[in-house]
Amino acid sequence: MWLRLRQIALIVADADTVAADLNAVFGIEVAYIDEHLPPAYGLQNRLLPVGTQFIEVCSPVRENTAGGRYLERRGGDGGYMVICQADDHAPRKARVEELGIRVVAARDTETACLMQLHPQDTGGSFLEIDWHVGADDLIPGWSHAIRGPWQDFIRTGRVRSIVAAEIQS
């Protein structure tokens, strides 16, 4: 069984400014803006590939969203979610239930599964564990996470991968 760090999501006041800063520092580019985020989230995003992983820059588009409240509690921009890709979702789901970790959001289909775990139960960050058909492929279609030719935006001149995430509560 394996679990791979796929994506780090940031919550920020201004997604465009932070995406531009990431480009200036790391040479990475926005590959995708998800126009299909659930309205209940009240967020906009920018996805920037880092090799075969992503940095997702999220910012609130309206008042009183979970992301906006977290941004206010933090007192500024910061980490929001750690998103991992699993080779098998069922054992992770069983372990989460066994530990009594609250699941904030979940989706199970024949081609993709995800569960977002409550930050109070995971040390200060949303932890999302995903599985999809073709999970062993490091450069999959990611049809559930990103649409379009995102691979065309991979820039490895300054950074090639995300190797860790340090979580603060």
Residue ranges with predicted function:
Residues M1-A19, D77-C84, G134-S169:
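N-terminal beta-strand motif that seeds the catalytic metal site of vicinal oxygen chelate
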Residues W2, R6-Q53, R92-L117, G157, ...:
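Core segments of cupin and vicinal oxygen chelate
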Residues A24, Y70-R73, I154-G157:
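A short alpha-helix capping/helix-coil boundary motif
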Residues V30, T65-A66, D137:
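Short loop/beta submotifs within extracellular cysteine-rich repeat domains
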Residues T52-Q53, R62, D87, Q120-D121:
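Short loop segments at secondary-structure junctions
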Residues I55-C84:
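A broadly used, surface-exposed interaction patch
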Residues E56, K93-V159:
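Vicinal oxygen chelate
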Residues D77-G100:
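A gly/proline- and charged-residue-enriched helix-loop-helix capping module
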